[in-house]
From Swiss-Prot:
InterPro entries: Ribosomal_uL18_bac/euk, Ribosomal_uS11_sf. The gene is Mrpl18. This is Large ribosomal subunit protein uL18m. It is found in: Mitochondrion. Keywords: Chaperone, Mitochondrion, Ribonucleoprotein, Ribosomal protein, RNA-binding, Transit peptide, Transport. Belongs to the universal ribosomal protein uL18 family. It comes from Mus musculus. Component of the mitochondrial ribosome large subunit (39S) which comprises a 16S rRNA and about 50 distinct proteins.
């Protein structure tokens, strides 16, 4: 009960000074903080749960769908590069095994389109390769499969896209799966 009159007295003093709300300390001795126990940080949990969904892929142990050897395109991959060339644009994207598009780049994007003379020529394909490779490396995708059709494989623009991706550090072959 003794604190209430002091509080209102201090508040009334502050109102007169027009300083807003302020609190005054009743003790002149600072509170002493106890030392922190550092032994808690040394304890290691007996079980470790890795929550990275791509961990098994990076180790080469994750399942790949098998039994699609007679079907084209082959479905034995973790990530697949797909290139779509339309009448006016070039689009490349990386597809995961479950069908989701992980990373993409297209000449329809204004950030890429404004630097190109044409959105369909060989230079556009090379630029798309560089941009997609940079985005893949930022996303942590270093390996992927690319299976071009025979008429696409002989194309200069597709060759330049492949060269741009490999020069940027992305391997267009996935490591073999470890069966143990």
């Amino acid at each position: 009960m003794a604190l209430r009159p002091r509080f209102w007295k201090c508040l009334s003093v502050c109102r007169k000074l027009e300083c807003g709300f302020a609190a005054l300390s009743t003790s002149s001795v600072p509170a002493v903080q106890p030392d922190v126990e550092s032994k808690e940080n040394e304890a290691v949990a007996p079980e470790f749960t890795n929550r990275n969904p791509r961990n098994l892929e990076l180790l080469g142990v994750a399942r790949k769908e098998r039994g699609w050897a007679t079907v084209w395109p082959n479905r034995e991959f973790w990530h697949r590069l797909r290139v779509v060339k339309t009448q006016h644009h070039v689009e490349a994207f990386v597809e995961h095994l479950n069908g989701q598009v992980v990373v993409s780049a297209s000449t329809r994007e204004w950030a890429i389109k404004k630097h190109l003379y044409s959105t369909r020529n060989v230079v556009a394909c090379e630029s798309i390769g560089r941009v997609l490779a940079q985005r893949c490396l930022e996303a942590g995708i270093n390996f992927m499969v690319y299976q071009p059709t025979p008429w696409e494989a002989s194309s200069d623009s597709i060759k330049r896209l492949q060269n741009a991706m490999t020069e940027s550090g992305v391997m267009l072959r996935e490591p073999r799966r470890i069966y143990e």
